[in-house]
UniProtKB/Swiss-Prot annotation:
Induction: Expressed in the intermediate phase of the viral replicative cycle. This is Glutaredoxin-1. It is found in: Virion. It comes from Cowpox virus (strain Brighton Red). The lineage of its organism: Viruses, Varidnaviria, Bamfordvirae, Nucleocytoviricota, Pokkesviricetes. The keyword Metal-binding does not apply. It holds the Pfam family Glutaredoxin. Has thioltransferase and dehydroascorbate reductase activities. One of its GO terms (molecular function) is glutathione disulfide oxidoreductase activity. GO terms for cellular component: virion component. Belongs to the glutaredoxin family. Disulfide bonds join C23-C26. Residues 3-106 form the Glutaredoxin domain.
Length: 108
């Protein structure tokens, strides 16, 4: 059931971030991503409160990404990890290039 919940939300040419809005790391990750202008439908924020039991979802995250914590961030169907991973990419000034290369940013 957790697999279906996650896989239905992942797609090529899309950024998906699984969050808990009470989590400061999730809010920080959203702040980074919200600096960019995404094409309609190319960016989805999923509150993990939508899924019960939460532990089942976290177990599935661990199975496919190696981590149970949120945020869990996916570029297409590929996990890039969590907040610290996103921050590292952003600090290298590579995030915009990566997002452009997967076709999720507006060009105008």
């Amino acid at each position: 059931m957790a697999e279906e919940f996650v896989q239905q939300r992942l797609a090529n040419n899309k950024v998906t971030i699984f969050v808990k809005f009470t989590c400061p790391f999730c809010r920080n990750a959203l702040d980074i991503l919200n600096k960019f202008s995404f094409k309609r439908g190319a960016y989805e924020i999923v509150d993990i409160k939508e899924f019960r039991p939460e532990n089942e979802l976290r177990d599935y995250f661990e199975q496919i990404t190696g981590g149970r914590t949120v945020p869990r961030i996916f570029f297409g169907k590929t996990s890039i990890g969590g907040y610290s991973d996103l921050l590292e990419i952003d600090n290298m000034d590579a995030l915009g290039d990566i997002l452009s290369s997967i076709g999720v940013l507006r060009t105008c």
